[in-house]
Amino acid sequence: IDGVAMSRSLKPIPNKHVQHLFGRPELNGLDGELIVGDASAEDVYTQTTSGVMSIEGRPDVSYWVFDDFTEDGGFARRFHTAYRRIKKQMACEDVPHHTVNNQAELLKYEQDYLELGYEGIMLRCPDGPYKQGRSTAREEFLLKLKRFVDAEAKIIGFTEQQTNTNEAVRNE
């Protein structure tokens, strides 16, 4: 927005390198996700958060673009516009999209991405409007298909130890 790379909560991304790469007016209006390293890596969230939230450093970051909220019309039209806008941009990737026509194709598509290491897939209505934030199941504009449950826990206490009894390991 206004030549500044922003987070989902509309706060500027702190990393100077990320701002240099993606905080440019020609990328205004694009919606996507910053990824540090391999997009299907098990620790991609941790690596990305660490890379983009550190002010200094040059993370191996790319911008995976999946929408353009400056374009009117349904998703298919907006994505086509986004793709045209990023195809010559350094470190920008378009998120692959595939049309599925039935449940069998959907299950195959999901299985293919699970085998690549992704945690699930996103389903989109090709004519759906842009919506900032999350779509509801009732709207059916954008749905997440992730077949496992993850959770967060609150730490309610700890006991500090005076020695490290962990097995010694070498970081290769």
Say what each PLM segment does:
Residues 1-33, 135-172:
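Classical nucleotidyltransferase
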Residues 1-93:
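Covalent nucleotidyltransferase
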Residues 15, 74, 101-106, 167:
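Intrinsic-disorder/low-complexity, polar/charged segments
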Residues 54-59, 112-117, 166-170:
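Short, surface-exposed loop and linker segments with low hydrophobicity and enrichment for Pro/Ser/Thr
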Residues 70, 87, 114, 159-163:
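Hydrophobic/aromatic-lined pockets within catalytic cores
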Residues 73, 130, 163:
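Conserved protein kinase catalytic core
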Residues 75, 91, 115, 119-122, ...:
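Intrinsically disordered or highly flexible coil/loop and linker segments, enriched in small
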Residues 97-160:
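Amphipathic alpha-helical
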